[in-house]
């Protein structure tokens, strides 16, 4: 997957965005990049705790949710979704949960760590040129 980091404006205010640039599975990868974009604003430390957890090989299972998404480190992959049912008993699942919202999306942990590190670097860099963009290829993680 290739991801585009860019700048934009909304109501005359600058913002930073990431989205799928090139993919074999745009639906899966779109959820991954949407989750990625929510990480810095979901944590007091701007996402560095998530990066540390993803890069820590001793962590084999840990929840790394953002405000809008649920995410789970599972050994060598990251599972992302709107509503993951891991660790839930059948009777605990609310009746109004749309089954489509429970479909997990996956990305290899190594690729996600690389992508998150690049995103946090981009996100925390001051905007000096509104036309500046970066294209990140997750295969470069290897």
Swiss-Prot record:
Top-level taxon: Bacteria
Pfam families in the record: DUF5376
Cited InterPro entries: DUF5376
Family, as annotated: Belongs to the UPF0275 family.
Protein name: UPF0275 protein PM0505
